[in-house]
UniProtKB/Swiss-Prot annotation:
It comes from the Bacteria. PANTHER family: UPF0502 PROTEIN YCEH. This is UPF0502 protein YceH. It comes from Salmonella paratyphi C (strain RKS4594). HAMAP family: UPF0502. InterPro entries: DUF480 (IPR007432), WH-like_DNA-bd_sf (IPR036388), WH_DNA-bd_sf (IPR036390). The gene is yceH. Belongs to the UPF0502 family.
Amino acid sequence: MKYELTATEARVIGCLLEKQVTTPEQYPLSVNGVVTACNQKTNREPVMNLTEQEVQEQLDNLVKRHFLRTVSGFGNRVTKYEQRFCNSEFGDLKLSAAEVALVTTLLLRGAQTPGELRSRASRMHEFSDMAEVESTLERLASREDGPYVVRLAREPGKRESRYMHLFCGDVDELSLQTSAPESASGDIQSRVEALESEVAELKQRLDSLLAHLGE
């Protein structure tokens, strides 16, 4: 597989994939939009505090690598960015809506169980049941042009195995286990986080609308 992203590059791409689906009226994103998305406190793990300069450097690098492209003109006063990471006209990586939702959530939050993924990815794709989540993960793990995700060894005392994306290279399972946050009620926490993300998205839309009306 030809993808070797840094953690920050994965965050930038994940944000663009997310916003393309959840807030299409604000997509493509400006540099400021990408900064805000990267530093969101909801649906992000770990929470980052990237500067505009740091994000601009990542954007420039990803454009050179053909994972993003710039969009300007047609009345746009600022340069905006859209992803070419997957499902682009000339790109090789083609993903279904379900696969995009899972890959995006893994890029933004790291290793997660199928249950966590189903809840957290629900704003991008409504999975009918857990079987659909698991079959989509297995498809991503066994693709001939992949694999793009890997199933991690089940941790002691946990009911579900976690999955991790492979777009940043091979996974250090020991490191993931030692850094994994403890969660006594993962399903409830995931639902709360999903609701918090929806509120954040709605606030962002309202701010954008008010700014537009004030112009």
